[in-house]
A protein has these predicted regions:
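P-loop NTP-binding core
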Residues: 1-265
Length: 265
């Protein structure tokens, strides 16, 4: 199955929320999903009901097979938190990730697994993890807001460069405009610009929706909180488009066809 990297040059765009609910969308459809948190903030676990006191994570397991450490959080859904860490542990972790073909060699049982869809969450901007995973990442999802700060990044994306050129690996990058509000003129203008300029690289838009915030506060998916919400519908549409782009079908609980991965092996 494919590896999807969710990354953004800008923080505060709702990236981790997108990761969590996208994972829920795929698992609800029958796909076996593993979510991996590469962000030292270690916040993704909170979207899946893990305790603040739970210190488990991949940061202390750089040379061990992560698939045996996956935590079951829902039907068809597993996660690997980043874990509690200090500066020295993060330095050792980054050094391990620098190994040639780290994800193909050390972590191949997870990242080259035909029965698992991997969705990886990253800290904003360039990171060693984002650099290292480029060799196995099939698609990069880049959440941005429909605001002035994000507009300043559009020209870099359109020219093919951002985050040290990492955007563009595999099948390339796809933009998600998050928290859109059509009552705001700038929001509407940014949407129109994105539609005209990114075209097929605009994966979709997610409406600003209090249901998302409330669901996160209760550590559940937006589908469990309100499956009829605008954001739930938007994320479902995006998930289906991702599956179409990557060329896989969801069938009764597992899997699928990923010709791109086979070509890369």
């Amino acid at each position: 199955m494919p590896v999807i990297s969710v990354c953004s040059p800008k923080g505060g765009v709702g990236k981790t929320t997108v990761v969590a609910n996208l994972a829920y969308a795929f698992s609800r459809s029958g796909s076996k999903v593993v979510v991996v948190d590469f962000d030292p903030q270690n916040a993704l676990r909170l979207y899946f009901g893990l305790s603040l006191n739970d210190e488990r994570g991949i940061v202390t397991l750089p040379n061990k097979d992560w698939i045996s450490s996956c935590i079951s959080v829902d039907k068809n859904l597993y996660m690997l938190p980043f874990g509690k860490s200090d500066k020295e542990q993060r330095a050792v972790f980054d050094e391990a990730l620098k190994q040639d073909n780290y994800f193909k060699n050390v972590q191949s049982s997870l990242f080259d697994n035909p029965d698992v869809l991997v969705i990886a969450d990253f800290a904003p901007g360039y990171t060693q993890a984002l650099d290292s995973i480029a060799s196995v990442s099939n698609l990069q999802v880049v959440p941005l807001l429909a605001d002035a700060a994000s507009v300043s990044l559009f020209s870099q994306l359109l020219s093919g460069g951002l985050m040290d050129g990492l955007v563009g690996g595999g099948l390339g990058y796809y933009i998600v405009l998050n928290q859109i509000d059509n009552r705001i003129k700038l929001n509407r203008e940014v949407q129109n610009f994105a539609l005209q300029n990114f075209k097929d690289n605009l994966l979709g838009m997610i409406h600003k929706d209090t249901n998302v915030t409330e669901a996160a506060g209760q550590q559940i998916s937006v589908y469990d909180y309100n499956k009829n919400s605008a954001a739930a519908f938007d994320i479902e549409v995006i998930a289906k488009k991702v599956a179409q782009i990557l060329g896989f079908d969801v069938k009764k609980g597992t899997k699928v066809i990923n010709p791109l991965r086979r070509q890369n092996v």
